[in-house]
């Protein structure tokens, strides 16, 4: 037998010996103070455990392999509206969300579809999700994500899926059409210093914090049955902040 390392090990070991131990004061005090109270405290902080994980995004890898040998037809292998994840069962509907979650258009509902070509040519784990960017606005939907190790929270929790489906078609995805201006730089201390100064003035924190305040105001207006015009104007502002957060995130790379 493995020796008990802490109080909870002793409690569980006593339970395994005699289930009547669950009727004792020692067990009830343990359950109240060590199980229920911490759970409630975590709920108050917004920490709720759900089935799922944070998966690293991998975009259209098989299509890139086909393109490298001149056999890419332009069609998606995984398919529009689908993802390939080993973390969930095949044909299960899953919800995806990334941080920062700026607006209601930043959630993804997708079908988990296992693909034979992905399994054949890629050695992926449960922490990697293969996604599709061909013919769908996935990267903008997931808060301006890209494929340089960005992650997405995936879950098959029915409560969250039901909530996501309520207004999924009503909120369009905020999309950035701003073209980045390329700046030629040299690998010198002067250019590195100039880049550090410019990126140090990044307003990403203020942008996301303001979006949170406006979202709180939006839902307060909804709960108090305010006019649709008020809601749409406010939502447009939130959408602009979503686009701005993506621009601010990317400017560090383009200089």
What is the role of each PLM region?
Residues 1-255:
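Core catalytic machinery and nucleic-acid-binding channels of phosphodiester-processing enzymes
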């Amino acid at each position: 037998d493995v020796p008990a390392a802490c109080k909870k090990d002793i409690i569980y070991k006593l339970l395994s010996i005699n289930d009547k131990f669950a009727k004792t004061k020692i067990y009830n005090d343990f359950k109240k103070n060590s199980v229920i109270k911490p759970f409630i405290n975590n709920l108050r902080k917004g920490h709720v455990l759900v089935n799922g994980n944070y998966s690293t995004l991998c975009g259209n890898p098989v299509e890139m392999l086909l393109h490298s040998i001149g056999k890419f037809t332009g069609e998606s292998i995984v398919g529009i509206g689908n993802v390939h994840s080993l973390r969930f069962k095949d044909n299960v509907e899953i919800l995806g969300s990334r941080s920062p979650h700026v607006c209601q258009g930043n959630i993804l509902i997708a079908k988990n579809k296992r693909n034979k070509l992905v399994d054949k040519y890629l050695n992926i784990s449960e922490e990697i999700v293969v996604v599709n960017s061909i013919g769908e606005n996935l990267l903008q939907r997931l808060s301006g994500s890209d494929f340089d190790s960005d992650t997405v929270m995936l879950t098959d929790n029915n409560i969250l899926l039901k909530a996501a489906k309520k207004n999924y078609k009503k909120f369009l995805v905020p999309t950035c059409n701003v073209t980045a201006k390329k700046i030629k730089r040299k690998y010198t201390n002067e250019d590195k210093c100039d880049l550090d100064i410019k990126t140090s003035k990044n307003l990403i924190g203020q942008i996301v914090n303001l979006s949170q305040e406006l979202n709180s105001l939006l839902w307060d207006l909804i709960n108090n049955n305010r006019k649709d015009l008020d809601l749409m104007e406010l939502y447009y502002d939130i959408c602009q902040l979503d686009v701005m957060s993506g621009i601010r995130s990317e400017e560090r790379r383009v200089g």
